[in-house]
Amino acid sequence: MSKELSPKYNPAEVEAGRYQKWLDADVFKPSGDQKAKPYSIVIPPPNVTGKLHLGHAWDTTLQDIIIRQKRMQGFDTLWLPGMDHAGIATQAKVEERLRGEGITRYDLGRESFLTKVWEWKDEYATTIKEQWGKMGLSVDYSRERFTLDEGLSKAVRKVFVNLYKKGWIYRGEFIINWDPAARTALSDIEVIHKDVEGAFYHMNYMLEDGSRALEVATTRPETMFGDVAVAVNPEDPRYKDLIGKNVILPIANKLIPIVGDEHADPELGTGVVKITPAHDPNDFLVGQRHNLPQVNVMNDDGTMNELAFEFSGMDRFEARKAVVAKLEEIGALVKIEKRVHSVGHSERTGVVVEPRLSTQWFVKMDQLAKNAIANQDTEDKVEFYPPRFNDTFLQWMENVHDWVISRQLWWGHQIPAWYNADGEMYVGEEAPEGDGWTQDEDVLDTWFSSALWPFSTMGWPEVDSEDFKRYFPTSTLVTGYDIIFFWVSRMIFQSLEFTGRQPFQNVLIHGLIRDEQGRKMSKSLGNGIDPMDVIEKYGADALRWFLSNGSAPGQDVRFSYEKMDASWNFINKIWNISRYILMNNEGLTLDVAHDNVTKVATGEAGNVTDRWILHNLNETIAKVTENFDKFEFGVAGHILYNFIWEEFANWYVELTKEVLYSDNEDDKVITRSVLLYTLDKILRLLHPIMPFVTEEIFGQISEGSIVTAAYPTVNLAFEDLAAHTGVESLKDLIRAVRNARAEVNVAPSKPITILVKTSDSDLEAFFNSNVNYIKRFTNPEHLEIASTIPAPELAMSSVITGAEIYLPLADLLNVEEELARLDKELAKWQKELDMVGKKLSNERFVANAKPEVVQKECDKQADYQAKYDATVARIDEMKKLVK
């Protein structure tokens, strides 16, 4: 057992050194018990781009809650940690650091640059693990993985080669999304579409014979030097006689043909479309149908190349302005039509993505997608929580495009393809024998290796490895809804293809962490929260309680310091009631307490309040376990909070004072036993959410670590509906008296007459047998409980189930004086309402003030209105008394 609890709860003291003690004791490793059912989770590997944010804290807290509970329930648990190399993101960070030193990756060369990236990785991997420790994550570091580890790299090469041999990976020249800042290809889901202010530029392309001009429109006039044709619909009577003729490309003054193609819609614009196969995906398809050349007029950094005439070397957006000016100068510009349109931006660098013809590697998705869709109709399907995300998954798989997997980066898994001077290509898991082979310089999309994470981390492709046989498929994946497409879907189809199994049985989807105004946290808004700052102020347990208790599966959660204050206050309450119980413990051990509680359950000892709290504890265990199993941690938290704060602390602990302050030593031992036993179960129930403080308190009452203590289970012997019903009626009576006192402004310290009328003889007997509790909580001068009590003329009355309660007021207050006081109070709230109403009716204030300031005034208005209405209700009640 540990040292005595400090008088005040100090999370820094409680949490200091605790994590290292757990690591030293190896309590986070699997038990190795082959008779136990395995339960495994692989951590969604954070990118080694920097420190973890609040979203990571939420994600990992939920996983830790699950794995800690399963460990306590006797499962053979594995929570496998690891990190992702995050190709484009990490490389961009390192290049940014190098730019600060005045150098580029090209100055260093590939090998030296990669050395710098590995140094970055080591630096931030250390930081991330320190953050995991502060969060209290019970991961098994002996199995830590990194996506560029040799074992995982071997899995990546095997998957690539196998898919290539099946014809499901291919290399070809197609239009892809190009990031000019990172100088790499992007997949469709790495492109974020944003509505931006732009324009349609209308231009005239003159027929070769000069007889007429065809008007075309584009949002990207700088690409016009890549135009190789204009298209018209072959059924469009305005233009079908022009098919086969030529137009003159302005500025370039070269001839390009007019082709007939259904891509040109007669109903849209002029019905004439310029065709730029190297810079537009639809034009690329038109070009293939008509065997048109592909002319790329842009460099990989977003500048114009030598085919752009005098605009060569210009940035694409500068070139756009210059080209438009030139078109106007030569009379080819018809008009500029301002319009908001959707433009793709790189998810990583934020720059506008350029559709660009490029030779890349692709994964053919049709059969992989079909397999994933079909699996959701089998017993091996993946269960989504909440279930609506199953539809999201299926919709994406039904509409998926081929996946571009090559990236023009240096940091990542280099593509296992080699070329020689004879134009031959070799694809294999190892380099080809002989000289003269050069490996493809591109690397694979980060998500290609991440898609293998659940099984590559378990030892695959070594299918006989102990971890793979024991812990795969994994039990549960926890992740945000923002990466269902990026990651979850890809893990499912790759796992089905290469292991024949689902990668995980369950997927718990959570939302995003937002600020108090509901905005997504971002650097640009400056509203990001560092979880380490929160932990420093409140402790990890308070942050974990907030994160677990704040939302339902699939929903976003709003962070606020007010909620953090409430979390800290709850833990402080637990600390204080624990100290109270321990201070009154008198050396009682948990084993003796358990034996005594058994006597309470069998009726050999104890009183009705003891049986009531044990019954409610039983219900709490059942409901919390049920909601944990459904990943409804918010519901479970609410149940725990209500039981601990309301039923245990506010009621039972207070009720025990009637016994603990008495002279009956036998009763005291029983009461202490129930207190200690219930505290023990509370700590175990809370431990998955609040590991640090529960370990600290548990050390006062038991040997060993709570990490491996048994999770509470329902004890049928504790079921006692009669005790539950009786004490709930007792509570109702006490609450009714307290509320009546408050309504007529009679202080709790002032003794009063209380009359309880009930025609239920059992209830009458119960109240009379527990009259000491009623007296302790209601402070009566006179208390009468009977079936025949005449209703007093001047009295406050309340009705509870089975009884009526009267508080005679004749000697307690002057009704006229109380009405006068209430009238003054009503005037006060009316004045406040008038002031806030005037402010909110000011259109300039509402339009110009910050939204949070306006909201604050609205909240004040609602608060004042509620107080006004309550005062009116109290006046009405008082007036009824004098009728």
Curated annotation (Swiss-Prot):
A motif ('KMSKS' region) lies at residues 520-524. Pfam families: Anticodon_1 (PF08264), tRNA-synt_1 (PF00133), Val_tRNA-synt_C (PF10458). NCBIfam families: PRK05729.1, valS. Monomer. A motif ('HIGH' region) lies at residues 46-56. Keywords: Aminoacyl-tRNA synthetase, ATP-binding, Coiled coil, Cytoplasm, Ligase, Nucleotide-binding, Protein biosynthesis. Belongs to the class-I aminoacyl-tRNA synthetase family. ValS type 1 subfamily. This is Valine--tRNA ligase. HAMAP family: Val_tRNA_synth_type1. It comes from Streptococcus pneumoniae serotype 4 (strain ATCC BAA-334 / TIGR4). It comes from the Bacteria. ATP binds at K523. Gene3D superfamilies: HUPs, Isoleucyl-tRNA Synthetase, Domain 1, Valyl-tRNA synthetase, C-terminal domain, Valyl/Leucyl/Isoleucyl-tRNA synthetase, editing domain. One of its GO terms (cellular component) is cytosol. The gene is valS. InterPro entries: aa-tRNA-synth_I_CS, aa-tRNA-synth_Ia, Anticodon_Ia_Val, M/V/L/I-tRNA-synth_anticd-bd, Rossmann-like_a/b/a_fold, tRNA-bd_arm, tRNAsynth_Ia_anticodon-bd, Val-tRNA_synth_C_sf. It is found in: Cytoplasm. ValRS has two distinct active sites: one for aminoacylation and one for editing. The misactivated threonine is translocated from the active site to the editing site. The C-terminal coiled-coil domain is crucial for aminoacylation activity. Residues 809-883 form a coiled coil. Catalyzes the attachment of valine to tRNA(Val). As ValRS can inadvertently accommodate and process structurally similar amino acids such as threonine, to avoid such errors, it has a 'posttransfer' editing activity that hydrolyzes mischarged Thr-tRNA(Val) in a tRNA-dependent manner. One of its GO terms (biological process) is valyl-tRNA aminoacylation.
